[in-house]
Amino acid sequence: ILCAGQEETYDFVEKLLIEVCELFPYKYFHMGGDEAIKGHGIWEKECPVCQAKMKELGIKKGKELQVYFNNRVNEILKKLGKTSIEWNDGIGDNTDADIVGHYWLLRSPSWIKAENNKKQCYRNKN
């Protein structure tokens, strides 16, 4: 899990994405993010930098910091001409509207929220 509270993290991610996007010239870029829920507790309880960022942003939960992180990465990807996709686990109320949610749980709470105003794709288990 990267430290979502440090600006250097976003500098690193941008350099990494520039290289990766040169290798894969596709329109869409899947950010993943479903395993990031394991880092929420670290951000909330163990990382003073993330705790300070959460306080600065007025957020209380690691999930909200993940949404902030994903939105920041989305801005980088947009500059590179990509459309971001992420697993539904990382979708929240403040997720940028142009991020495509990739849903694999039928009618999960995040799916229902997304139906209101977010782009989405669905993975059929069959």
What residue ranges belong to the model's regions?
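Active-site neighborhood of glycoside hydrolase catalytic domains
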Residues: 1-98, 105-107, 111-112
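Aromatic-lined glycan-binding groove of carbohydrate-active enzymes
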Residues: 109-126
